[in-house]
Amino acid sequence: MRIIKFEPKYRDDLIFMILEAKNALGRVPGLNEDLLDIQQNYFDKGDMFWIAIDDNDRVIGSVGYNSIPNSNDVVLHRLFVKNNLKNQGIGTALLKTAEEHLISIGKKAAVVHLGNKEHFYESWQFYPKHGYVEFEPNYMRKELFKSMK
C-alpha cells in the first residue's frame, strides 16, 4: 500500500470505494458532492486530499481536510477504508499522513464531525485511539502541537 496525493485519474475508483464503505456500514450510500471535484474543493483552497492505493493501483482508503477560516484548525473529511481491508492499519496510516502534514504547515488542531454514536460507532472507536476527544456533541478534536511531544 502507498499513500499519495489524490490524482484525478482515481476519482471514480475513490467514489466507488466510499459508496461501498458507506453501504457496508448499513447507510444508504449517498454521494458527497465535494468528491466530484477534489481539485476545486480541496487543492484550490490550499487544502489536501490523500488516497491509499493497493498493489493493483486501486483506491483502498482516503482522507482530506479543509481549513477553518480565521484559525489554525482544520476539519478532517472522508476518512474511509475499503470495508474488507479494515483493521489493517490503513486508516491509521492515512490519519498519520494528514496529521504530520498539518503539523508541518503550522496547523494547531484537527476537528472531525462523527455523527451519532449509534450509526457511526466505528468512528467513535477509532478517533479516541488516536488522541481525539469529544468537545461538542458529535464532534471530536485533537490538539496537534501536543501530539508531537
Report the location of each language-model feature.
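Short coil/turn motifs at secondary-structure junctions
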Residues: 68-70, 81-84, 117-119, 147
